[in-house]
């Protein structure tokens, strides 16, 4: 088995999907989890206005709506959380995503004050954060807020990670990577677009340039610029296609060096890092 085949198998990726079937699979997955633990009453998700959170949010609301109708439990709710750092550049996209999702409840938590307070506390301890590390601080503060909300609403935090992010480790450890349940796991980027198109999502929300937008020195830095490969390259790789050797090597390099993010926490029984 080649490394490419191993990666595809590990991430559960498929070369072709039926969007309607995958929508139903994700919705049923979320419903089944909540039904297994009836003390859980909410799904909580941060909405950024990008493709991934828009899709995960829509699937979450669909799951909650169906489960509420099936059980008669009106305590069930989907909570969409806006988590800007100050003023968000693509705020209109966030509002458009909210309008598309139609969440039961929308909360806004501005994380800037908390991030600056944490940065100042570290500075007083003699640690000056780089812009990159401050970006990770933002991602972790967003997740901290979501878990606080979930804790107060008997909820679970929904993740947006999918195969095209998992393969590159393009998420913050214990930030956007630190979630309870990931309904998009297995899908690549273009497949996520197919699901949103099938759901009737406004095109600009899934055709926009993907960006984590965490760094102050490089605002709205495209994911593809940070990774050195395009999402089309990554999707082709995950679909088993043959790529230029340099591109494949870059993708595989990301996979190997970010393995620690996909195995949390590392224990004495792990040896992947020795290879």
Curated annotation (Swiss-Prot):
Key words, A-Z: ATP-binding, Ligase, Magnesium, Metal-binding, NAD, Nucleotide-binding
Residues that coordinate or bind Mg(2+): 52, 165
Binding-site residues for deamido-NAD(+), renumbered to this chain: 140, 173, 180, 260-261
Gene3D superfamilies recorded: HUPs
Binding site for ATP: 46-53, 160, 189, 211
Pathway: Cofactor biosynthesis; NAD(+) biosynthesis; NAD(+) from deamido-NAD(+) (ammonia route): step 1/1
Pfam families tied to this protein: NAD_synthase (PF02540)
Listed GO MF terms: ATP binding; glutaminase activity; metal ion binding; NAD+ synthase (glutamine-hydrolyzing) activity; NAD+ synthase activity
Residue spans crossing the bilayer: none
Any one Gene Ontology BP term: NAD biosynthetic process
Cysteines joined through disulfide linkages: none
Family annotation (InterPro entries): NAD/GMP_synthase, NAD_synthase, NH(3)-dep_NAD(+)_synth, Rossmann-like_a/b/a_fold
Catalyses which reaction(s): deamido-NAD(+) + NH4(+) + ATP = AMP + diphosphate + NAD(+) + H(+)
Enzyme class: ligase
Cellular component terms (Gene Ontology): cytoplasm
Keyword ATP-binding appears in the UniProt entry: yes
Record-linked HAMAP family: NadE_ammonia_dep (MF_00193)
Family listed: Belongs to the NAD synthetase family.
Record text on subunit structure and interactions: Homodimer.
Protein name in the entry: NH(3)-dependent NAD(+) synthetase
Lineage of the organism: Bacteria, Pseudomonadati, Pseudomonadota, Gammaproteobacteria, Enterobacterales
Primary gene name: nadE
